[in-house]
Amino acid sequence: MSFCSFFGGEVFQNHFEPGVYVCAKCGYELFSSHSKYAHSSPWPAFTETIHADSVAKRPEHNRPGALKVSCGRCGNGLGHEFLNDGPKRGQSRFUIFSSSLKFIPKGQESSPSQGQ
């Protein structure tokens, strides 16, 4: 059973081009393609953020080991972080809605922090 409802449209689930995923609302850098990995859930999965402040986290009620994540700059809802559920022992799995992301191909980044 999935933790989130799936309505389709997850265009970045099987997207593995080199580049950076930024917040669709404000353009702040969130995840690198280097931290993206294939996962059985229908949402794009990442192991880590680009910056320590890329995302804000708050506990998910009645769900130990799960945190709601939002953009660290504008507060746009992104999805969840599942602690110790990544591809390697001790890694997290960030399960992120494609609609909350914009992809910037490698070489087309405009600055170290998009949207400034």
UniProtKB/Swiss-Prot annotation:
Disulfide bonds: none annotated. One of its GO terms (molecular function) is peptide-methionine (R)-S-oxide reductase activity. Keywords: Cytoplasm, Cytoskeleton, Immunity, Innate immunity, Metal-binding, Nucleus, Oxidoreductase, Selenocysteine, Ubl conjugation, Zinc. It catalyses: L-methionyl-[protein] + [thioredoxin]-disulfide + H2O = L-methionyl-(R)-S-oxide-[protein] + [thioredoxin]-dithiol; [thioredoxin]-disulfide + L-methionine + H2O = L-methionine (R)-S-oxide + [thioredoxin]-dithiol. Its cofactor is Zn(2+). The keyword Cytoplasm applies. Its main location: cytoplasm. The active site is at U95. Binds 1 zinc ion per subunit. Its EC number is 1.8.4.12, 1.8.4.14. It is found in: Cytoplasm; Nucleus; Cytoplasm, Cytoskeleton. Truncated MSRB1/SEPX1 proteins produced by failed UGA/Sec decoding are ubiquitinated by the CRL2(FEM1C) E3 ubiquitin-protein ligase complex. One of its GO terms (biological process) is protein repair. It holds the Pfam family SelR. SUPFAM superfamilies: Mss4-like (SSF51316). One of its GO terms (cellular component) is nucleus. Zn(2+) binds at C23, C26, C71, C74. It comes from the Eukaryota. Residues 1-106 form the MsrB domain. Methionine-sulfoxide reductase that specifically reduces methionine (R)-sulfoxide back to methionine. While in many cases, methionine oxidation is the result of random oxidation following oxidative stress, methionine oxidation is also a post-translational modification that takes place on specific residue. Acts as a regulator of actin assembly by reducing methionine (R)-sulfoxide mediated by MICALs (MICAL1, MICAL2 or MICAL3) on actin, thereby promoting filament repolymerization. Plays a role in innate immunity by reducing oxidized actin, leading to actin repolymerization in macrophages. Belongs to the MsrB Met sulfoxide reductase family. This is Methionine-R-sulfoxide reductase B1. It comes from Sus scrofa (Pig). The gene is MSRB1.
